[in-house]
């Protein structure tokens, strides 16, 4: 028999949320109504300007045997039962709620049982394809190292997860991989590249601003998700149309007519002008064709130009992504933030 069983989902207030009743029946426990929790739920709904529906009463039911697991994010509490040698835990299916409860209650419970967990290190990389990355670090991974290595690609890059029972072995291998990949690794542990870029800027006392076209404000959004970003990020302009590129950023009409909105020349002017407009130390710009329409033979869908200006200098990087609009926006924002990060490292 397993030591631990965890289920997720079905603890909501709707008719198809039947997990609570099924679990009560399976365990053979009675239940009662938690009046205090019901009052708490009503207060929480009232704070947001709503009257609580009667259907939510089911979320105030608690077993006469077993434990209730608190939920600091939502209204559905979890449940925990002991069935002979097996612990049964059921959690909400909403990812944000489930993750929060795992971190706040379940993982501490598991650790308290004396369960040993392997040592782990996460190396986050960007700007290097998975196959190229694996080939590049082969001199380190081909040797006997007694570690488990996992590769997790995303639109932002590739995460390398290294685990080992021995901390010294883990440290040695991760150090070798870090030496090989250098600045392709932007973070150790699960940190967003925006947080890294903001941290570098704050440490160096630098400020930056962004001029966005094809990303539609995504870069600014990612930056402002970082607490304290106002110490480095001055602001931005979403210049989606040519008219706004001219009036809002001062891109020359002759540049747009001769080279087009998606061009190195336009990206260059956008970066220089947003730098000047906000009196920043760095000006970041992106312009491209996110897709799936709008591409031409000369400028296919997925083409992107990223500009980075610093007083007296400006450089532009051309990238080619695929045909999926949302993915292109994510990848462009990541590449732009990485360009800023590298510039700050080498300042």
Name these PLM-found stretches.
Residues 3-4, 282:
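Short, Asp-centered acidic motifs that coordinate Mg2+ and/or phosphate
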């Amino acid at each position: 028999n397993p030591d631990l069983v965890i289920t997720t989902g079905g603890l909501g207030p709707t008719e198809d949320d039947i997990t609570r009743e099924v679990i009560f029946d399976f365990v053979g426990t009675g239940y009662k109504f938690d009046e205090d929790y019901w009052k708490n739920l009503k207060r929480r709904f009232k704070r947001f300007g709503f009257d609580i529906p009667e259907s939510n009463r089911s979320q105030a039911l608690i077993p006469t045997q077993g434990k209730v697991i608190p939920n600091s994010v939502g209204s559905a509490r979890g449940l925990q039962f002991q069935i002979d040698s097996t612990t049964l835990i059921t959690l909400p299916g909403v990812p944000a709620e489930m993750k929060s409860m795992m971190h706040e209650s379940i993982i501490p419970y598991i650790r308290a049982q004396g369960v040993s967990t392997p040592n782990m290190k996460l190396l986050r990389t960007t700007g290097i394809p998975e196959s190229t990355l694996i080939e590049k670090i082969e001199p380190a991974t081909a040797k006997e190292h007694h570690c488990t290595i996992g590769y997790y690609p995303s639109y932002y890059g590739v995460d390398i997860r290294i685990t080992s029972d021995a901390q010294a072995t883990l440290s040695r291998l991760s150090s070798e991989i870090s030496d090989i990949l250098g600045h392709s690794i932007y973070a150790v542990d699960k940190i967003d590249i925006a947080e890294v870029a903001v941290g570098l800027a704050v440490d160096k006392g630098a400020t930056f601003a962004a001029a966005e076209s094809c990303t539609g404000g995504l870069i600014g959004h990612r930056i402002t998700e970082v607490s304290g970003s106002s110490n480095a990020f001055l602001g931005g302009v979403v210049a989606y149309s040519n008219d706004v590129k001219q009036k809002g950023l001062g891109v020359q009409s002759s540049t747009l007519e001769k080279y087009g909105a998606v061009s190195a020349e336009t990206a260059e002017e956008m970066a220089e002008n947003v730098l000047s407009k906000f009196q920043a130390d760095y000006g970041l710009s992106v312009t491209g064709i996110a897709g799936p329409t709008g591409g031409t033979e000369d400028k296919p869908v997925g083409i992107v130009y990223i500009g980075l200006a610093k007083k007296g200098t400006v450089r532009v990087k051309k990238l080619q992504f695929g045909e999926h609009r949302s993915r292109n926006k994510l990848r462009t924002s990541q590449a732009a933030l990485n360009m800023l990060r590298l510039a700050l490292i080498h300042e």
